[in-house]
Amino acid sequence: MSTSDILESLIEKDNGYLITSKAVESGVSKPSVSKYVREHDMEKVAHGIYILDDVWPDELFVLQQRNKNIIYSGETAIYLHGLIDREYSHICFTVPTGYNATHIKKKNKEVRYANPEILDMGTCEIPSSSGNLVKVYDKERCICDLIKDRKKYEIQLYQTAIKEYMSSKKKNLSRLIEYAVKLGVRDEVMMYVEVMV
């Protein structure tokens, strides 16, 4: 397989993105990546990340490619799961406690911290609005976090997300209760389950 073939395969797999680190892992040298980028007039969207000229930048995908420790949570994850129809007002993500996120704490970004014991609980990959896979908390973890931090959310967003989840045929109540116990919100979650299901 030629260098061009390898890079084209990576670009196809990542929906028009060329990620230098993935190319290097596949055996392509950085100078070869740079040459390919120049020859194909690709646009740089972040350090080591390029896109074809007919691809819209996907902020969630790019941010996560640059920062592998982040997991989309809060309003961002709730929106991606379709529990609210209004797009998130800011990007919310969770990182391990002690992680230095000052390089990504910018406008419209909310950083949350979680202990290692619960950080990865309920993670999954789903498509962003642009169709790229991003790592987020599953619906059940989102609902537990929402209930735990209810004062941080607008009442309409809070109620809509809870109602959407509780009326969904794809909810997993045993998983919801398992997470609720681990996150210390079992009683609050059970109140919603008993009333709405």
Task: Please give the residue ranges for each predicted region.
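Nucleic-acid-binding surface
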Residues: 6, 16-22, 45, 49-197
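Short, surface-exposed ligand-recognition loops at beta-strand->loop->(often short) alpha-helix junctions
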Residues: 25
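Basic amphipathic alpha-helical segments that dock to polyanions
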Residues: 35-40
